[in-house]
UniProtKB/Swiss-Prot annotation:
Ranges of Basic and acidic residues composition bias in the record: 51-62
Name of the protein: Large ribosomal subunit protein eL29
Family: Belongs to the eukaryotic ribosomal protein eL29 family.
GO cellular component, one term: cytosolic ribosome
GO molecular function: structural constituent of ribosome
Keywords, comma-separated and alphabetical: Phosphoprotein, Ribonucleoprotein, Ribosomal protein
Length: 76
């Protein structure tokens, strides 16, 4: 008996392009539905701890001002 055919790509390209090959829609914020609850709670605290741009710039300027008169640390 002859061996049967294992694979063919016949007509697959036509079938795929019949309705067009579309890119997946880009999601700005991915859904958290079904995600681990423990992770989501931790994520909430992590987001709350982030500083706004203005706050971080203000803290940076304060840090620079406090180091103004001090000598630079010596590295060995």
């Amino acid at each position: 008996m002859a061996k049967s055919k294992n694979h063919t790509n016949h007509n697959q390209n036509k079938k795929a392009h019949r309705n067009g090959i579309k890119r997946p829609l880009r999601k700005r914020h991915e859904s958290t539905l079904g995600m681990d609850v423990k992770f989501l709670i931790n994520q909430r605290y992590a987001r709350k701890g982030n500083l706004s741009r203005e706050e971080s710039v203000k803290r940076y300027n304060e840090r620079i001002a406090s180091q103004k008169g001090k000598p630079k640390p010596v590295t060995l």
